[in-house]
Amino acid sequence: MKGFFTKMAIVAGCFAFSATMMAQTKALSLSTYEGTNVAQYDGQTRNVSMSRSVFNGWNTFCVPFSMTTEELDAAFGAGCKLETLSAIEANGNEIDLYFTDVKAGGVKANTPYLLYYTGENKSVRVQAKETTIEADDAPAVLFIADNAFVQFNGAAKHIEADEQTAMYGIYVKDNAEAAFTLVTPETNGFYATRCFITVDGVKNPTFKAHHGELPVTAINAVKAENSSDDVYNLSGVRQNSIQKGVNVVKGQKVMVK
């Protein structure tokens, strides 16, 4: 009988393991409107499927999993473009946003992007196979220029616009040029998997998007800082040059992609 119960325990254990594996390999359906609490799936490798509305022109895109370039093309067409914010310039309340092409590297989890779509306005099926879920309630990248702190944010859930926090997004009527404008409480705010910009240090900012180029001043600034003794990592250790990720330069956090 002891041997029988031991075998039963082994069988039960194997069944539980198999059930867990089946649950993790089953396609995970995510909401692109209200959002999905993906914390319960954090670290799991899953097949992911979701339905996302897109419009001809520039859209925004941020998801809690990675996608290959091939999966991106399968969803949005081979003519789609994928760009991320790489630098900013500030002149008074005028802020220039510099976006660069990163499509060749695919989609990285919790990274805010601009997505250019050449098809007709519709809802498309987005799928990714065996991708790792990475939970992040507030994905964002921060850039600093003069007194302007510009943050490019991803919406992990539906975020309503309010009077307290100025949030800037791309309306469909403005998406030919990726024009970021103030989103008012009268609108629906930002649905999950979309992106928006917030700004500190500048009142009533206006934005101009640039694609496929970087400002000369930003390039020179990076080169100059590479020889500076004022570059540290987040642990306070001095660096010989600016590294990828978050650096502390002259007391300010600077993101390098």
Model regions and ranges:
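Acidic surface patches and DE-rich sequence motifs
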Residues: 89, 173, 198-199, 233, ...
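C-terminal outer-membrane/trafficking sorting elements
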Residues: 215-257
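A short, polar beta-strand/turn micro-motif
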Residues: 24-76, 101-179, 183-217, 255
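N-terminal low-complexity, intrinsically disordered segments
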Residues: 80-102, 108
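Sec/Tat signal peptide C-region and signal peptidase I cleavage site
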Residues: 17-23
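Bacterial N-terminal signal peptides that target proteins for export
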Residues: 1-11
